[in-house]
């Protein structure tokens, strides 16, 4: 059985630690799902986010992103990554372990 780690990101800090954690999990064969919400959606406009491409399954709260008036053109995420809290709820259900930043 594959292991899955869920990461809930509400803070606009610690992107470097998040990236290192995701890379370490991938190296160990652990699938990772990350959901960005509230202030955490600010990280989605950071160019460093590209380091997560192909490593993790990423979604972000569309309402949170829009409420902060962030620029969609500044993110490398695909339009399909914009989601709702229901994705977060499914992530909790599907994951073996769950962390919050």
Model-derived regions: residue spans:
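Histidine-anchored nucleotide/phosphate-binding helix
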Residues: 14-27, 34
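Short, glycine-rich nucleotide/cofactor-binding loops
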Residues: 4-16, 38-39
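Short, well-ordered alpha-helix to beta-strand connector turns
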Residues: 29, 55-56, 95-96
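C-terminal structural segments of small proteins and small subunits
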Residues: 73-101
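A short beta-strand-loop structural module common to alpha/beta enzyme folds
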Residues: 31-40
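Hydrophobic anchor at the start of a short beta-strand
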Residues: 5, 32, 58
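A glycine-rich helix N-cap at a beta->alpha junction
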Residues: 48-75
């Amino acid at each position: 059985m594959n292991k899955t780690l869920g990461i809930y990101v509400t803070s606009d800090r610690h992107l470097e630690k998040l990236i290192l954690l995701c890379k370490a999990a991938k190296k160990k064969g652990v699938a990772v799902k990350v959901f960005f919400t509230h202030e955490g959606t600010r990280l989605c406009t950071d160019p460093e986010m590209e380091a997560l491409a192909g490593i993790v399954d990423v979604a972000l709260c569309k309402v949170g992103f829009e409420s902060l008036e962030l620029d969609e053109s500044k993110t490398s995420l695909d339009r399909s990554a914009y989601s709702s809290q229901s994705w977060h709820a499914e992530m909790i259900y599907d994951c073996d372990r769950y962390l919050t930043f």
